[in-house]
Amino acid sequence: MTRVPRGYIARRRRTKMRSFASNFRGAHLRLNRMITQQVKRAFVSSHRDRGRQKRDFRRLWITRINAATRVYKVFDSYSKLIHNLYKKKLILNRKMLAQVAVSNPNNLYTISNKIKIIN
């Protein structure tokens, strides 16, 4: 029986996986089975960490806003600041507030003066 050379489909699949693994090192770059395992693992990690990144940044923004409100005596806490923002219907998200708190705390103070409730 004559030998039949393999088609291009498997080779195309392997080269596609190899292109994903172009920055790997050692056997993870050279051996096809290791490449497929590591690429699958990398995809799982990247998918998981896209969700985690959103949570981490939100936590970072909240921490920055809370620190700025306490240091500059804007409010007693972060939660009171956010509560009064919602009461006054000011649409400022946490990312914007954190940037203001870090770069220019005076503007945070003026924002707080706008939303403070006069009894």
Swiss-Prot record:
Example GO BP: translation
SUPFAM superfamilies registered for this protein in UniProt: Ribosomal protein L20 (SSF74731)
MF GO annotations: rRNA binding; structural constituent of ribosome
Pfam families from the UniProt entry: Ribosomal_L20 (PF00453)
Compartment(s) where it occurs, according to its Swiss-Prot or TrEMBL record: Plastid, Chloroplast
Chief location bin: plastid
Swiss-Prot/TrEMBL keywords: Chloroplast, Plastid, Ribonucleoprotein, Ribosomal protein, RNA-binding, rRNA-binding
Disulfide bond sites: none
Highest rank taxon of the organism: Eukaryota
Keyword Mitochondrion found: no
Entry keyword Transmembrane: no
GO cellular component, one term: ribonucleoprotein complex
UniProt xrefs under InterPro entries: Ribosomal_bL20, RIBOSOMAL_L20_CS, Ribosomal_protein_bL20_C
Role according to the record: Binds directly to 23S ribosomal RNA and is necessary for the in vitro assembly process of the 50S ribosomal subunit. It is not involved in the protein synthesizing functions of that subunit.
Family in the record: Belongs to the bacterial ribosomal protein bL20 family.
Protein name (Swiss-Prot/TrEMBL): Large ribosomal subunit protein bL20c
Organism: Triticum aestivum (Wheat)
